């Protein structure tokens, strides 16, 4: 049983071992892996990390073997989320872009009986929906990547129409008819919530220092290390990466249906075939590993 992995070493490489290297308790065989904003940021050198690291933060995988406890997971298919005990999967610890990989059990999410490609993005949809549920009106979303779009769609489904601040490409969000600000001078000053989703530090700095808001919501996927803040009477900083409740599942399903219309699925028989597909264009794609 040979192991192939898409590893970022300063550049993207496909590394092959004659056997399977198991570093974490849960050995997985990935089935679907979503490739999107995080992988693009890493490959283009926009997101600093300590290489080498196996890419792939979101996906669906079958558990092949478990060491220690949780042996009941063996043979089951799970969605895999990027949030766990050891940092962000595919960025701070080895991810899913491999024919076999091992992870800590804290990254396993839902058990799937009939896995579909769109399930690979369900953890991101759930994360974005959780952010939407925590937001106070009016809502300004910083960034125009997939996390930002999904948060906006979830807000729309619960009756809140957000606005966006995007210094870079806004094409993905624009096609859904949201209000988009491109220049800080055009942005309305007072907001209920500002949601930070991008890795653009300059963008986040402008919003948090120049605008008034009651609540600041920070996605861990924005890799926000620190933010200079003005003194305010009421300010909260929140990292949201919890599971969604059953109350939110209808919103998750609606957003999933929307996303399935714009995300393509690419089948590959060998990981070497993905090199020409990376870095991915927005909104990314789902890799189906045979």
Model-predicted regions and their roles:
Residues 80-141:
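NAD(P)H dinucleotide-binding glycine-rich loop of Rossmann-like/cofactor-binding domains
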Residues 1-3:
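Extreme N-terminal starter segment of soluble prokaryotic enzymes
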Residues 20-34, 44-84:
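Glycine-rich beta-strand-centered segment in the early N-terminal region that forms part
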Residues 140, 244-290:
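C-terminal hydrophobic helical "lid"/dimerization subdomain
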Residues 136, 174-239:
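Glycine-rich cofactor phosphate-binding loops and adjacent beta1-alpha1 units
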Residues 81, 141-145, 165-168, 196-201, ...:
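Structural motif
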Residues 5-13:
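Extracellular beta-rich ligand/substrate-recognition surface
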Residues 116-189:
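Mid-domain Rossmann-like dinucleotide-binding core that forms the NAD(H)/NADP(H) cofactor-binding site
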């Amino acid at each position: 049983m040979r192991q192939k992995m898409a590893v970022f070493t300063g550049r993207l490489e496909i590394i092959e071992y004659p056997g399977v290297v198991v570093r974490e308790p849960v050995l997985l065989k990935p089935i679907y892996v979503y490739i999107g904003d995080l992988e693009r940021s890493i490959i283009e050198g926009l997101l600093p990390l300590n290489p080498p690291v196996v890419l792939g933060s979101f996906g669906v995988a079958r558990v092949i073997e478990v060491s220690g406890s949780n042996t009941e997971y063996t043979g089951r298919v799970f969605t895999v989320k990027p949030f766990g005990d050891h940092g962000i999967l595919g960025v701070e610890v080895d991810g899913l872009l491999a024919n076999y990989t091992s992870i800590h059990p804290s990254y396993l999410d839902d058990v799937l009986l009939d896995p579909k490609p769109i399930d690979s993005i369900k953890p991101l949809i759930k994360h974005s929906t959780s952010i939407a549920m925590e937001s106070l009106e009016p809502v300004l979303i910083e960034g125009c990547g997939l996390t930002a779009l999904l948060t906006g769609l979830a807000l729309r489904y619960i009756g809140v129409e957000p606005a966006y601040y995007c210094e870079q490409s806004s094409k993905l969000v624009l096609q859904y008819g949201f209000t988009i600000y491109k220049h800080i001078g055009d942005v309305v000053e007072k907001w209920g919530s500002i949601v930070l989703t991008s890795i653009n530090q300059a963008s986040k700095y402008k919003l948090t220092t120049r605008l008034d808001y009651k609540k600041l919501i920070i996605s861990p996927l924005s890799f926000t290390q620190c933010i200079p803040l003005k003194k305010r009477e009421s300010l909260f900083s929140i990292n949201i990466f919890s599971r969604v409740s059953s109350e939110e599942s209808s919103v998750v399903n609606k957003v999933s249906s929307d996303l399935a219309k714009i995300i393509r699925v690419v089948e590959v028989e060998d990981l070497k075939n993905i090199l020409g597909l990376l870095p991915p264009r927005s909104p990314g794609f789902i890799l189906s590993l045979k």
